[in-house]
């Protein structure tokens, strides 16, 4: 509690100082970026020196960063934006864009892109930006432009331990369970999986592609049937829950498992966990952090039921938004445009100073310092992306052709507007978090708890909610197919 209070005070002071400076000079020479995580020592030095000089030279402005720890980011973001703190740019997950728009946290960007974003369109094509459209207007920049089929459906495993257990690959949920059982026996110091991976397991157990499309984990869209479903009433939910229950009863799952992004990633990076949910490239994103605690670690990602089609369901998972109350929205768009305007700028922002922080050897990027700058995963762009020297060429070939045979989902670009069902949505979230999540993760008995949870969900209004999502989905597809 004391640590949280100190952090909040520090954030408020930082925002207050920045806001005071903006009001004092009354100019548009500064942008303030709200950013998740903790600022590394080298990043702090970089921002004050080389980056500050570059921003002044190229854009004639300053860039200020306000870091918020991962476990507080979303709560503090909502508080700051509601209080109209002077934030010009922030990051969030693209699937939540409609919620941010409904909260009036995101500006329409069409005019800003036309005036200040022309350079970025060379590497962020219009169809990428269309993924952030709501009612015809663009409300964010989908900042990660890279292969994305089967997003959140892969499992990133400790390949070194898998092979030490006498196994070579993972294709099924049964393979995962066998791996966990062998590892528990042969590596008792390991703590099991880092999260219950319900999305990869849903791919495995579902009869069709199911994509989450509203109210976090409660509502899914079936690509084959073209229907919206209450996820908790699908056969896949039951099968995932029963599978996870067996994992829990065998002591493979621990009581503290959640699917929260920052928590599960923090776990696996300790080097003491067997796997974590991921998307293409997950192993390369986290390997350095894992190796810091387990130098012998090797990571590899697997797709359960690999013979089944992969779907592209969104234009990436990240989005950059400019608040409606931003003091300098023009500067924020100029900054985004600058970052994507050349590979030189892109590498400078993501990796620092060439020769000091990184070097390029034979077309590969070799980091000379362990510190993070602007997060690579947040701004990843396949036109500029370089791989580390230790990444196998076979992986790069797979990565670059990953989407070649993927199917574009019928729901790509859909954003649910919850205006008519806000109270129902809140009630559903309450039931989902308190009653359905423990069932899904396998922490409680399915047969005993599910009927009670389902009745609570019905009482909350899930049927009316699903009907509203279906209505909007039908309208969206009808408009798209005109």
PLM-predicted stretches and their roles:
Residues 9-13, 17, 21-482:
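Extracytoplasmic/secretory soluble proteins
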Residues 1-4:
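Positively charged n-region of N-terminal signal peptides that target proteins for export
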